[in-house]
Amino acid sequence: MKRHLFRLTIGLLMLAVCGWDCLVCGAHPNGSSCNQYRLIEGSTLVDDCTICGRPTLLIPIRGSFYLEPNEIDPLFSNFGVRDLKFTSVGPYWTYSGKLEGTYRMGGEVAVVQQMKLEGIINGIEGLEFDSNLVPLQATFPWIEIDLEQLPPTNPLQTFRLHLVAVAWPTVWFSTEVSFTPSAPGATKVSDGDLLSVTGQVVCTNNQLTGRLGIMPIVPDIGLDAVMWLIPSLHQQKGTPTPEIWFSAERDIFSETLGPLHDGDLLSNAGRIVRTYADLVAKFSPMPPVPDFGLDAITLGPDGKLLFSTEEGFFSEKLGVSISDGDLLCEDGRIFKTIGQLLAKFQPIEPRPIQFGLDAAYVWPSGEVWFSIEADFVDSKWGRIGHGDILSDTGRVVARNSELLAPFGPIEDLADFGLDGLEVFGSVLRADFDQDGNVDFRDYAVLATSWRLNCCTTCPAPDFNCDRKVDFTDLKIFAENWLADVE
């Protein structure tokens, strides 16, 4: 049925939405795709007056851009920087900018980088910036770079940019407390629901637990650890679709599976993936093995399960005490201690803190994104909350308030916590609302962008960043739609 509906609606899209003009639009010859980047905390704009005595203004900024791969020459990887938009953060000054340009990275001996941008800041047009060739300040795909404004400059207002950017993939998470979105008619979001940073509820707690055989009326059992397995990583027979693996926040009884513990790893397909005893078995904790809980779950670079527990314990095999903040591997080794995860941060508290490890995601490179259970004050970043996403590179990837902003909670809380975290580059690029499938809501996004035709920015459906949503993008959308049918 979905196939037939798709064929019909594609025809309607061509004629009713874009009109006959779309039949003469050419496809972009470069089939490369754009990667969305996000300007994170640490990005700043400097507003300086070189001939007067006013203070130099250091303005925190946030924003995003698209990094488009271009040709690779013998020495450099070259990229286009598309649709870089930023706004100021804070109540004192209002700045906004829109820039575009190029970025290259490489070198013959040492690895260097260069970014060139041009555009508008606060209505001032024709601004140009150049970093020149400078050493890397961060390991790619992170980008950290300083850009100076090129002459001619206005001595009364000269700008400089410091950009800290990270590739911003699909991010799912859960909170520690429930909240009410501000959208009219929105229902309360549970601390057991799985959410997307786009402001969507990916999966309610009842949808996650619906096949576990819990006696109705099924209560909300919370959501602690979470991960999403795509088919390329999980090829279990009889499981044709991806599964969400998760842990609950309390014990409950299943009529089909028996007792379910908060330390068990469960599947929305209706099975126990690992019991709490299975997960810690190779660490040889002192018997009898209690339920230590399950706080974080993710896959390591080698495909093995990594996890953290809610309680520490002593490993007879390793001869050490395991902290509730350590990231453990199911093969019986410590992947990273909480000390290693926080090594590049600088807590200023005079007393030891039990940080804990509430959520974690490990990139193929080994970089870890994570959240902790206790707030602390850092000498560089200030207060770090238990709902912030941190990187073991020593950066704050996203504040809890930024994650919740698309929902607009009406509750006045500084931090809603972060219990579960899953990060992945979307398997289906046309999954614009990041709910795990391509459906009519994504189709509506495509149709809306198509009406713009020859757009001046790169909307999500402009897969190849050629500034228009045309048949090349429609082909990719169709492939994603039909792939979601299989």
Predicted regions and their residues:
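Bacterial N-terminal signal peptides that target proteins for export
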Residues: M1-I10
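Bacterial N-terminal signal peptides
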Residues: T9-D21
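N-terminal segment immediately downstream of the Sec signal-peptide cleavage site
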Residues: H28-P74, W168-V177
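Predominantly extracellular/secreted and cell-surface proteins with exposed
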Residues: T50-L161
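A recurrent domain-boundary module in secreted/ectodomain proteins
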Residues: L147-A167, L413-R429, E479-N480
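Cellulosome-associated attachment modules in secreted, modular CAZymes
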Residues: T170-V189, W245-R271, M286, L306-I322, ...
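Surface-exposed loop and turn segments in beta-propeller and other repeat-based domains
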Residues: Q200-V218, G270-V289, G332-R351, R395-F424
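Signature of short aromatic-glycine-proline-rich micro-motifs recurring in repeat-based ectodomains
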Residues: I217-L233, P288-T298, P350-V362, D412-G425
